[in-house]
């Protein structure tokens, strides 16, 4: 007699923590970046502020962008965030800027721009000119350069409180949401470059590795040199020949 097959029950992924604090008066500006370690192209930085009402943002499919196995589900999550977050914002720095300033400086500047834009957008959405004490930056990682914002209520610059959370994209919903927006924006940028310049896929496999130092990418650099969009200050790009693509 044939043994009946067991039906697999898919385990529901537990929701990430919605907020870092329990302060309902505080707007948490959560941030993450994508492409920090890439050898090609831009680094993207994103911020997300969630609505206080959980019914407006369930967070059911929100997780660390690296945990998605389906590109379709990743993009669906990104669209959900854009439609349902209180506010969101994306910034980037290109390869030349990264080489001139260094990657850490570019990420910090991008995060500062995200905070500035997020405060402006929250004020617009709520139709209230909040003072800086109503905002806090929640940053993925272990380092953040403090940011000061002009407060019209005090007529001077006030430092925005912040915390850093290592592996925060696996702990907090809004940081995970920011990681999703940053990753999808960067992936789209690389794929658009590959469509415009097919040689990027042919020589470096960028349509697959999106700029990370995979075997195919490294082999392409060793054989063909680097393009004007590679980061000249990263790894083997420092000594590689530059070949301009037109």
Predicted regions: what is each one?
Residues 1-246:
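RNase H-like, Mg2+-dependent phosphodiesterase core
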């Amino acid at each position: 007699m044939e043994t009946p097959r067991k039906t697999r029950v898919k385990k529901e992924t537990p929701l990430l923590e919605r907020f870092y604090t329990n302060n309902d008066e505080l707007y948490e500006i959560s941030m993450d970046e994508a492409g920090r370690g890439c050898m090609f192209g831009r680094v993207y930085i994103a911020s997300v502020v969630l609505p206080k009402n959980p019914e407006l943002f369930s967070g059911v499919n929100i997780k660390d962008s690296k945990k998605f196995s389906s590109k379709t589900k990743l993009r669906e999550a990104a669209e959900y965030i854009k439609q349902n977050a209180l506010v969101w914002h994306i910034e980037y720095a290109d390869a030349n800027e990264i080489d001139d300033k260094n990657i850490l400086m570019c990420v910090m500047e991008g995060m500062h721009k995200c905070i500035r834009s997020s405060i402006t957008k929250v004020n617009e959405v709520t139709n209230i000119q909040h003072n800086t004490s109503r905002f806090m930056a929640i940053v993925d990682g272990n380092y953040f350069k403090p940011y000061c914002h002009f407060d019209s209520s005090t007529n001077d610059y006030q430092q925005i409180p912040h915390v850093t959370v290592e592996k925060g994209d696996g702990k907090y919903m809004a940081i995970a949401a920011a990681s999703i927006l940053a990753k999808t924006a960067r992936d789209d940028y690389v794929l658009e470059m590959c469509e415009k310049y097919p040689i990027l896929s042919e020589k470096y496999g960028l349509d697959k590795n999106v700029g990370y130092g995979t075997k195919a990418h490294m082999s392409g650099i060793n054989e063909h040199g680097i393009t004007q969009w590679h980061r000249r200050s990263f790894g083997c790009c420092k000594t590689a020949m530059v070949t301009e693509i037109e």
